[in-house]
Amino acid sequence: MSAEFFSSKREEGSLASGPSFRSNQRKILNLLLERDASFSISSDLPTTPVEKKLFGDSANLSILSGGTPKRCLDLSNLSSGEMSATQLTASADLDETGHLESTGPEQVRLAGMNYRQHLIKCSPAQLFCSTPNALEHGRRKKDAICGSSANKENDNGNLVENEMKHLGSPITTVSKLHKNPELAEDQAEEISDELMEFSLEDQEKAKPPLNWSSLYRSSSLPDSLNSPSLKQVVKFKDSTIPDKLKKKYCSNQKELGKGLGLKKMVSLCDINMTQMLEEDSNQGPLIGDFSKVCALPTVSGKHQDLKYVNPETVAALLSGEFQGLIEKFYIIDCRYPYEYLGGHIQGALNLHSQEELYNFFLKKPIVPWDNQKRIVIVFHCEFSSERGPRMCRSLREEDRTLNQYPALYYPELYILKGGYRDFFPEYMELCEPQSYCPMHHQDHKAELLRCRNQSKAWEGERQLQEQIALLVKDVSP
């Protein structure tokens, strides 16, 4: 209805009486309410989205006034889902004479504007409806107002969304889930699945790779800093072996490993094997076949692979102090013949060439009559630095070739430390004749040259024979 209706009714009310006018007007109002369901007041001002939210799309209002409402409108026809919660209570206040307080359309517009501003500033108005649905919706609205602190962000979002749509803003918001519960559940499941996939991908990306640190290692860092060793000791609960037994078992295994290693090294290096066995025996150095301890006391010398004895030991040997252990001994003088004739130890044999040495000892090996006694050979030259040690090694090598390792014909070979030069001044009485002829004597230069050439020829022949023997072994199947 328009504002002209109110102006015409006001003119008729002035002619009629007060009570009759009031009853007639109420009937007309009820008829109009049943027909149109509400009074529509048109204002020149455009409605905002906030007003649409509060008043609804139709902006249904009763006659507005500044006083309290005196009649609750029956808005049962308007309770249709969404609009049932936006019904407002208002009635036209009449004065005692039956006249309306608002006398014109302008006052109605002003009253509507003031009431709209009042509703925007204040909390939502309480609704009085005649239908149970409206009452229930009003109760729900009241509960929602009580929890407005929790739902404030959602309400503000809805208001902003409606206002954007009214103003034609290009900014859009995220669409809500469908009102259909089945579709809403499907959408919720899809969203939850996507969120789970994103969370799993983030976790996988967040996990650092295990081996990338070694691939992208800085070359300036040392290996100990860049790739720390992570050692973890795993202890099993079911293990019933005590720690003491474990340590004992490990030590036994280590000792067994050492023993096996020693047996394996015998065929590789005689010197290392001899030194190890000597350290283990704690009784002294062993003889060449590793069966017994040396009968003569040894001292350190120039060559570590050979055993040295001092002049005192040789003198004791000559005097017969080792008869209980030694059945026979030989002192080999490796000097040249003119040196030997110039003075030598009592009972010494002059063998200055390898051929003579082999013929004497290896052509017919000397075997002791008593197996408990030994045969001892002592080599020496002027200083026991070259010729004596060379002859001793030569005899040992040839003896090895004739026997199966570690057996030897002559397992005990010694070197007189210091040679004849050191022995003669101390034990001149044990020398025959009691004199000393050096190798570089002026009277024996020609003889020295002849002996050297002869020794070189013998050495060349020996090397040639060894090469021939190696070739024969390689050719033979």
Swiss-Prot record:
The modification N-acetylserine is found at residue 2. GO terms for biological process: cell division; G2/M transition of mitotic cell cycle; positive regulation of G2/M transition of mitotic cell cycle; positive regulation of G2/MI transition of meiotic cell cycle. It holds the Pfam family Rhodanese. The active site is at 381. Belongs to the MPI phosphatase family. It is found in: Nucleus. It catalyses: O-phospho-L-tyrosyl-[protein] + H2O = L-tyrosyl-[protein] + phosphate. Signal peptide: none annotated. Its EC number is 3.1.3.48. Gene3D superfamilies: Rhodanese-like domain (3.40.250.10). SMART domains: RHOD. This is M-phase inducer phosphatase 3. The modification Phosphothreonine is found at residues 48, 68, 131. The modification Phosphoserine is found at residues 20, 38, 58, 62, 65, 123, 130, 169, 192, 199, 218, 220, 476. It comes from Bos taurus (Bovine). Residues 325-432 form the Rhodanese domain.
